[in-house]
Amino acid sequence: MTRVPFSPLHRQALGWLVLSSAVAVLASCGGGGQAGRAGGQGKKTVIQNKGSDTMVNVAQVWAEEYGLVAPDVEVEVSGGGSGVGIAALLKGAVDIANASRDMKPEEVRQAAKNTGKAPQGFIVGYDALAVYVHQDNPLNEVTVEQLAQIFAEGGSATRWSQIGVRIPGVADDTIVRVSRQSSSGTYEFFREHVLGNQDFKQGSRDLNGSKEVVELVGGTLTAIGYSGMGYATPAVKKLKLSAKAGAPAYEPSVESVTNKTYPLARSLHLYTLGEAQGPVRKYIDWIMSDAGQTVVQEAGYVPIPAGQRPKP
């Protein structure tokens, strides 16, 4: 596992990467949340895990699979978005926060202020933030600049014809922009890396979950949206993406994430308060084992290469 110390600063969506979602920390192991409070003979240790919707499906599978390995441990997984998970961690309400973005410097400071503990981050895998259109949309590739023109406040593209796309059988080619809510790490990553931290245009369809974004795009001929690459369905098309006009366009894939050619590749994180120990450490070690990484691989995300994984 690649550990990132802070400076100032199921199988339904399975596919290839995902790494962050069900882990916790016993109160006696230096973490917050509810872990270990169930204790006692015959009772399970409960690990509370909350955060990134991108990772929630893989986290649920991890929890199920780990329950077969460690039947005395129960991992309770919930989504809500990276920001929601981190906020819960900062209050000591959960043991593990999942995030598809880096923790912000102010969040690190808030954790220390609230709990007296420094957050510990773990990169547990990689994802490509894919751009989706309806399967019948003739568009096959797009540039980051074109995406900004579509999604950013002040961007000039409001109709498909303005970027040279004509959708057969569509009279009104107004672009339906499908986005995420502001508590989402996916939203923040897209805003930073595509919009250059500009505001989004008003009038987009802002949804709670990654799956919901893809479902809406798959049911709307004129829609475009963004979500983790593991959420693709036959109803949508993943666009190739180029960093700028004239540059090569790359499909979001394991290969393009691994060789860093895809412009919107990102790391996925687990965050704990303080160093993970005891049952939590064992759970993280299991996630980074062949068994845990197989779940990641089957989830549509990019697992940590075997040579880069720590030995338990």
Where are these regions (language model features)?
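Short, low-complexity disordered leader/linker segments with a strong preference
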Residues: 1-45
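Exported/periplasmic ABC-transporter solute-binding proteins
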Residues: 29-127, 132-312
